[in-house]
C-alpha cells in the first residue's frame, strides 16, 4: 500500500534540495524570459493529481482503455473552454507541447517534401517554422521570410513575392521574438492567392488574444496552435484550434496527434489546462493581459531613453528585442551579468546578427512573469533602469551587487506565491 505521508524530502534529499533551490530562485530572481510565466496553485493542484495514473489513449467517448469516464469529463471541459476562449469550433488539448502541436499540423496537412513558407528563426520565427535543424526544415522544403530592416516589421511584400515564386502548400504566421502586431488577414489573402493553407502559431500571444488585446487569428487561419503556458499562464503543453468548419481537416488533425505523433495523453496536464482556460475566462485575466502590454511598453521606452536600441523601436505586445550591437556587448555576456544581479533574461539573435546563436548580439525581454507577480509600470521602469545600470558596464561588480540587493528587496515586496 502507498502511504499518503510518503515524501520526497525523506526519500530523495538531493532532488528535494534541487526543487527547493529552484523554488527559492523563482521567488528571489526577476523573470524576464518572454516564454516563461508563473502558473496558479489551482493549476499545480490539478497537475499533481492522481489523474497522472490514468492511461487514456484515444479521445473522449472513444478510448482504447476502460475506466476513462472521469478523465473524459476533464478533457471535455478543457475542449469546451478552449473553444469558448478563442471562438473555435475545433480544439485538440492533447499535444504535449507547442512543437508537437505544430508537428501534428504538418503531418495532417502536408506530405514529406512539400513546400512551406515561414518566418526565419534569425528574424524572430520559431524552430518549427522551417528551421533547417528542425523536422520542419529537414522533412519539408522550407522557404523563409523576414522583417524589413528599416522598420523592424514583417515585410508583407516579401512574403507575397516568395509565396508567388515558390507556391507553398502551407504558409506559417507567428513568432517567438517579434514585437509587432501581425495582420492575419493579409497573410490569409496571400495564402488564398497561391492556394496554400494558412497555419498560425500564436504561442506567444495566446493570452493577449484570449483577452481581446491582440487580433484573433481564428477567423483567418485554417489551423491555429499555441502553447498553454507563456501568456496563457497554464501548464506546459500544446493546443490545436480551428474555426474553418472543415470536418475533414479536424479529422486529419485528430489522427495526426493520436495515433500519428503521440500515444497516451497526459490527463493530469489536460486537467490543468482545463483549470487554466477557466481562469482565462475570468475578468481578472483581461486586466492582467492589459498590464502585461503596459509594462512591456514602459520597459522598451525606458531602454530607448537610456540609449539602447530596441528592434522595431518599441513593442505592441508582451516582448521586445534589445539590440546590443552598438554597445559592443554580446547577448551571452549581458545575460550572464544580469543573472548575477538576479535578473533572468535570455540571449537572442537580432536581425542580421553577426554573432552565432550561442553568443548573439541581443536579449529577448518579456513582461508576463513580472506582471503576474504584481509589477505595474512604476516597478517595470525602475527595473529597466537597474538593468541599464548593469549593462552600462557589465564588469562593474559593485553595480551588480547593488542591483542584486535592490532586486531582492523588490521580490520580497512582490512574492510569486503570497
From Swiss-Prot:
Keyword Cell cycle attached: no
NCBIfam families in the cross-refs: PRK00011.1
Site description Plays an important role in substrate specificity, residues in chain: 229
GO biological process: glycine biosynthetic process from serine; tetrahydrofolate interconversion
Protein name: Serine hydroxymethyltransferase
Keyword flag Cell membrane: no
Localization in the cell: Cytoplasm
Matches recorded under PANTHER family: SERINE HYDROXYMETHYLTRANSFERASE
This protein's encoding gene: glyA
Species for this entry: Shewanella sediminis (strain HAW-EB3)
Any one GO MF annotation of this record: glycine hydroxymethyltransferase activity
Amino acid at each position: 500500500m502507498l502511504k499518503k505521508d510518503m515524501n520526497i524530502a525523506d526519500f530523495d534529499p538531493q532532488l528535494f534540495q534541487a526543487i527547493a533551490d529552484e523554488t527559492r530562485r523563482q521567488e528571489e530572481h526577476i523573470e524576464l524570459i518572454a516564454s516563461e510565466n508563473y502558473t496558479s496553485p489551482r493549476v499545480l493542484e490539478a497537475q499533481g493529481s492522481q489523474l497522472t495514473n490514468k492511461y487514456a489513449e484515444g479521445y473522449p467517448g472513444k478510448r482504447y482503455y476502460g475506466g476513462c469516464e472521469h478523465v473524459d469529463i476533464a478533457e471535455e471541459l478543457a475542449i469546451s473552454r478552449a473553444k469558448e476562449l478563442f471562438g473555435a469550433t475545433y480544439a485538440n488539448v492533447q499535444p504535449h507541447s507547442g512543437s508537437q502541436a505544430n508537428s501534428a499540423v504538418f503531418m495532417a496537412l502536408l506530405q514529406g517534401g512539400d513546400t512551406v513558407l515561414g518566418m526565419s528563426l534569425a528574424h524572430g520565427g520559431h524552430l518549427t517554422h522551417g528551421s533547417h535543424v528542425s523536422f520542419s526544415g529537414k522533412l519539408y522544403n522550407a522557404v523563409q521570410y523576414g522583417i524589413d530592416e528599416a522598420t523592424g516589421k514583417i515585410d508583407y511584400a516579401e512574403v507575397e513575392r516568395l509565396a508567388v515564386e515558390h507556391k507553398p502548400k502551407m504558409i506559417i504566421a507567428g513568432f517567438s521574438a517579434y514585437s509587432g502586431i501581425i495582420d492575419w488577414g493579409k497573410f490569409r489573402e496571400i495564402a488564398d492567392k497561391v492556394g496554400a493553407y494558412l497555419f498560425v502559431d500564436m504561442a506567444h500571444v495566446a493570452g493577449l488574444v484570449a483577452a481581446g488585446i491582440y487580433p484573433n487569428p481564428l477567423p483567418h487561419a485554417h489551423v491555429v496552435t499555441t502553447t498553454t503556458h507563456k501568456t496563457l499562464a497554464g501548464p506546459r503543453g500544446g493546443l490545436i484550434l480551428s474555426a474553418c468548419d472543415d470536418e475533414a481537416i479536424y479529422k486529419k488533425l485528430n489522427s495526426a496527434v493520436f495515433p500519428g505523433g503521440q500515444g497516451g495523453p497526459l490527463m493530469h496536464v489536460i486537467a490543468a489546462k482545463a483549470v487554466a482556460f477557466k481562469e482565462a475566462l475570468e475578468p481578472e485575466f483581461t486586466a492582467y493581459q492589459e498590464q502585461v502590454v503596459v509594462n512591456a511598453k514602459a520597459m522598451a521606452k525606458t531602454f530607448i531613453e537610456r540609449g539602447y536600441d530596441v528592434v522595431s523601436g518599441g513593442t505592441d505586445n508582451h516582448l521586445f528585442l534589445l539590440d546590443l550591437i552598438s554597445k559592443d556587448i554580446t547577448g551571452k555576456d549581458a545575460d550572464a551579468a544580469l543573472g548575477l544581479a538576479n535578473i533572468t533574461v535570455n540571449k537572442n539573435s537580432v536581425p542580421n546578427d553577426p554573432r552565432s546563436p550561442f553568443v548573439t548580439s541581443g536579449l529577448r525581454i518579456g513582461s508576463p512573469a513580472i506582471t503576474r507577480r504584481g509589477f505595474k509600470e512604476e516597478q517595470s521602469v525602475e527595473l529597466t533602469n537597474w538593468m541599464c545600470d548593469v549593462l552600462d558596464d557589465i564588469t562593474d561588480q559593485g553595480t551588480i551587487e547593488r542591483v542584486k540587493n535592490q532586486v531582492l528587496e523588490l521580490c520580497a515586496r512582490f512574492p510569486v506565491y503570497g
